[in-house]
C-alpha cells in the first residue's frame, strides 16, 4: 500500500509528511542513513533455457499486487479461509509496510518504506534474506517465477531521502536477494510492477510507463502520460490500463506501447485499476469511482463518495448478488457497487479514512482504516461485519490458499483459520 492529502501515521523509524492543501500523495520520511545506489546493471544475457517451474499445488502463488494481472484482488475458492482467524506467528519489520507482500513457494517478498527488500518464510516467519536497495519506497513487488526474479520499485536511492527522486527499478534473485539488474528512474516510482510473459510493466513519478525485459532489464518501450503514474497498471486482452495525475485514464498496447484510448476524469488518479466485466474500475481524488468500457474508454457509470478515493477496487461475482465492486473512500466508508450499473448495494463506515485497497478472500471482503488502525472483514453479500483486528492501515490481507497473512502498520501476521 506515496503522499496523500493528510498526515496518516507516525512510526519510530518512519514519518509520513503530507501537505493538507494538496491532493498529492504523502512523501514518506526514511531513516537518514546513507545507503548505496543499486549496483550497475550487468550486460544483457539470454534467458535461461530451463522450463517454467510449476508451483506446488498446495501453495497458490500471489505474484503481484492485486493477485492477478487484471488486479481484481479476488482470491477464488477461498471459503476455507473464512473467519474465525487467530494469530500463528508475527514478524515486526520496524518500518512502515504501506503495500502488501507477494507469495511464492512458501516465501513472502516485500519492501518497507525505508527501502529494505526482504524474503520471509511463510511457514514460520523467519527471515530468509534482507537487503537494502534504496531509501524510500511505497509499492508491492512482483514475481517472475520463470526466471526466479522479484522486482521492486523505489522512490529514491539517495541517502536520507524524504521526497521522491533518484529512484530505480531493481530485480533481485528470489533465492538469494542478489541484484540481477537495475535501471534508474530519475523521478522515482511507487508503481507496483506487473509481470506478463517476458515483460515487466510499471510507471514513474514523471509520467512515464515502461516495459522492461524481465531477465536483463532491456527497455522494450516507454509511454508518456499526462502526469505522474503513481498506481500500478492492470493487464487484460494484451492491453495495459492505468490512471495518472493529469486526470486521465489510458489504455496502451502491451506489445508496443501505442495508445489505444485515453479518457478524461475529474481529478488525479492514484488508484490502481481493476479490469472485469468488460470495464475498467478505479477511484479518483475527486471522490468519484469510475467504470469505463475497456474497449473504448467511454464511461459506463460513475458514483460519488464523500471524499478522496485513493483506494483501489476489488471485484467479485457474488452468489445471489451479482458482479460487485468494493472500494473505500476517505469519507470512511467501504462501498459495494453493482458492477454493471454503479448502484450502491451497501456501504458501511465508522472506522476512519480508507486509503488502501479492499481484498476479497472467500466470502469476506477485508479493508483497513487509517483513523482507527484496524482491519475489518465483512460478508461480501450483506456487508455484515465478521472480522476485526487491531492493526492495519492500508491493504490488509493476502493468502497462499492455506492461511491468511495480515499486514499491519509495520508487522506481518500469519492468521490461521479454524480447522
Q: Model-flagged regions — what are they?
A:
Residues 31-32, 36-37, 121, 173, ...:
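Short stretches within intrinsically disordered, low-complexity N-terminal or propeptide regions
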Residues 121-124, 173-176, 213-217, 253-256, ...:
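Short loop/turn segments that connect beta-strands within beta-propeller blades
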Residues 73-76, 114, 121:
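Short, glycine/acidic-enriched capping/hinge loops at junctions between secondary-structure elements
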Residues 22, 40, 152, 175, ...:
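Intrinsically disordered/low-complexity terminal segments and short unstructured peptides
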Residues 18, 24-98, 109, 126-133, ...:
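Aromatic (tryptophan-biased) beta-strands that constitute blades/sheets of beta-rich domains
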Residues 1-25:
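Hydrophobic single-pass membrane-targeting/anchoring helices
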Residues 17-18, 59-69, 94-116, 135-170, ...:
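Repeat-blade elements of multi-bladed beta-propeller folds
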Residues 8, 21-23, 38, 119, ...:
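Compositionally biased regions
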Amino acid at each position: 500500500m506515496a503522499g496523500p492529502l493528510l498526515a496518516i501515521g507516525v512510526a519510530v523509524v518512519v514519518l509520513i509528511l503530507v501537505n493538507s492543501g494538496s491532493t498529492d500523495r504523502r512523501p514518506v520520511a526514511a531513516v537518514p542513513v546513507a545507503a548505496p545506489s543499486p549496483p550497475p546493471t550487468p550486460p544483457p544475457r539470454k534467458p535461461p533455457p530451463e522450463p517454467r517451474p510449476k508451483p506446488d499445488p498446495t501453495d497458490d502463488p500471489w505474484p503481484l499486487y492485486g493477485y492477478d494481472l487484471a488486479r481484481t484482488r479476488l482470491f477464488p475458492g477461498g471459503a476455507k479461509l473464512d473467519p474465525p482467524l487467530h494469530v500463528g506467528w508475527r514478524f515486526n519489520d520496524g518500518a512502515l509496510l504501506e503495500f502488501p507482500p507477494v507469495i511464492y513457494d512458501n516465501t513472502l517478498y516485500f519492501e518497507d518504506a525505508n527501502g529494505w527488500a526482504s524474503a520471509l518464510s511463510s511457514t514460520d516467519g523467519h527471515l530468509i534474506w534482507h537487503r537494502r536497495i534504496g531509501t524510500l519506497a511505497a509499492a508491492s513487488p512482483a514475481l517472475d517465477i520463470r526466471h526466479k526474479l522479484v522486482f521492486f520499485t523505489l522512490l529514491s536511492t539517495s541517502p536520507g531521502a524524504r521526497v521522491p527522486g533518484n529512484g530505480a527499478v531493481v530485480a533481485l534473485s528470489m533465492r538469494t536477494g542478489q541484484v540481477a539488474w537495475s535501471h534508474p528512474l530519475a523521478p522515482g516510482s511507487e508503481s507496483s510492477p506487473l509481470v506478463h510473459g517476458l515483460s515487466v510493466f510499471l510507471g514513474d513519478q514523471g509520467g512515464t510507463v515502461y516495459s522492461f525485459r524481465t531477465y536483463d532489464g532491456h527497455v522494450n518501450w516507454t509511454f508518456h502520460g499526462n502526469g505522474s503514474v503513481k498506481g500500478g497498471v492492470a493487464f487484460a486482452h494484451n492491453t495495459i490500463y492505468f490512471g495518472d495525475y493529469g486526470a486521465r485514464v489510458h489504455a496502451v498496447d502491451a506489445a508496443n506501447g501505442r495508445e489505444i484510448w485515453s479518457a478524461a476524469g475529474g481529478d488525479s488518479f492514484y488508484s490502481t485499476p481493476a479490469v472485469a466485466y468488460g470495464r475498467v474500475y478505479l477511484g479518483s481524488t475527486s471522490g468519484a469511482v469510475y467504470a469505463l468500457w475497456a474497449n473504448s474508454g467511454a464511461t459506463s457509470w460513475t458514483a460519488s463518495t464523500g471524499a478522496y478515493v485513493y483506494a483501489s477496487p476489488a471485484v467479485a461475482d457474488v452468489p445471489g448478488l451479482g458482479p460487485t465492486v468494493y472500494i473505500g473512500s476517505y469519507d470512511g466508508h467501504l462501498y459495494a457497487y453493482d458492477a454493471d450499473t454503479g448502484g450502491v448495494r451497501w456501504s458501511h463506515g465508522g472506522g476512519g479514512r480508507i486509503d488502501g485497497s479492499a481484498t476479497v478472500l472467500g466470502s469476506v471482503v477485508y479493508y483497513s482504516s487509517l483513523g482507527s488502525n484496524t482491519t475489518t472483514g465483512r460478508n461480501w453479500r450483506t456487508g455484515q461485519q465478521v472480522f476485526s483486528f487491531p492493526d492495519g492501515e492500508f491493504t490488509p490481507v493476502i493468502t497462499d490458499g492455506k492461511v491468511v497473512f495480515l499486514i499491519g502498520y509495520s508487522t506481518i501476521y500469519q492468521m490461521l483459520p479454524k480447522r
